[in-house]
């Protein structure tokens, strides 16, 4: 959500119009698996031609740097670090200045929560559907164990506290508990 809602403008969204090939490149930025595949001579030539033609040159140079200067991993790490920071503080700065990429964005927890609102509603519905499928009422649930990186996001903790007795919502290590659960299931011989 951070990339789509806040960072695509740095790569030309909103300034590049009526050029489907360029728009496709810009919209590929959130897909970390697709980005390295874009570093072809044809795409480089397309970007350079658009830059020479004056199509959002600063923004497309930033996109070119991201794709061709092997900066995707650093970029996605900055985004992930911002999400982690917003779990414990009200704002953070996404900053990446290297090899032709000059990106700086102040990002607040409020913006983040607005950006993930649709996802939060979907997750809440999945939780409610899961409880309903269990045949239990929320008050009958003994413990709700928060797991995974997103479980540290305050909006999700608040949602769980609304749905269940907050005393029953248990924090776990968000990064190792999923792995531990899989190991337990594997040891029990269950198919995953």
Locate predicted features.
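Phosphate-binding glycine-rich/basic clefts of nucleotide- and phosphate-handling proteins
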Residues: 1-98
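Residue-level signature of catalytic and energy-coupling elements of molecular machines
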Residues: 2, 79, 127, 146, ...
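Short glycine-rich phosphate-binding loop at a beta-alpha junction
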Residues: 17-28, 131-148
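Adenine-nucleotide phosphate-binding core of ATP-dependent small-molecule kinases
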Residues: 64-72, 101-130
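Glycine-rich phosphate-binding loops at beta-strand->alpha-helix junctions
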Residues: 67, 71-72, 138-160
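Phosphate/ATP-binding catalytic cores across multiple sugar-kinase/actin-like superfamilies
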Residues: 82-85, 115-140, 144, 185-188
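Generic beta-strand/beta-sheet core signal
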Residues: 97, 144-149, 172, 183
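Conserved phosphate-binding/catalytic loops in two-lobed NTP-binding clefts
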Residues: 139, 157-184, 191-192
């Amino acid at each position: 959500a951070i990339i789509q809602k806040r960072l695509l403008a740095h790569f030309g969204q909103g300034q590049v119009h009526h050029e489907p090939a360029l728009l496709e490149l810009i919209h590929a930025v959130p897909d970390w698996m697709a980005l390295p595949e874009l570093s072809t001579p044809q795409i480089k030539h397309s970007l350079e031609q658009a830059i020479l033609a004056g199509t959002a040159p600063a923004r497309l140079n930033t996109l070119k740097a991201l794709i061709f200067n092997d900066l995707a991993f650093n970029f996605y790490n900055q985004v992930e670090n911002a999400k982690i920071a917003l779990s414990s503080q009200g704002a953070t700065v996404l900053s990446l200045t290297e090899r032709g990429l000059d990106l700086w964005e102040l990002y607040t927890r409020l913006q983040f929560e607005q950006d993930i609102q649709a996802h939060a509603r979907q997750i809440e519905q999945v939780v409610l559907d899961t409880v309903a499928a269990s045949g239990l009422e929320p008050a009958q649930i003994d413990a709700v164990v928060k797991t995974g990186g997103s479980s540290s996001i305050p909006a999700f903790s608040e949602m769980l506290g609304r749905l269940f007795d907050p005393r029953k919502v248990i924090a776990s290590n968000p990064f190792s508990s999923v792995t531990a659960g899989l190991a337990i299931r594997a040891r029990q011989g269950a198919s995953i």
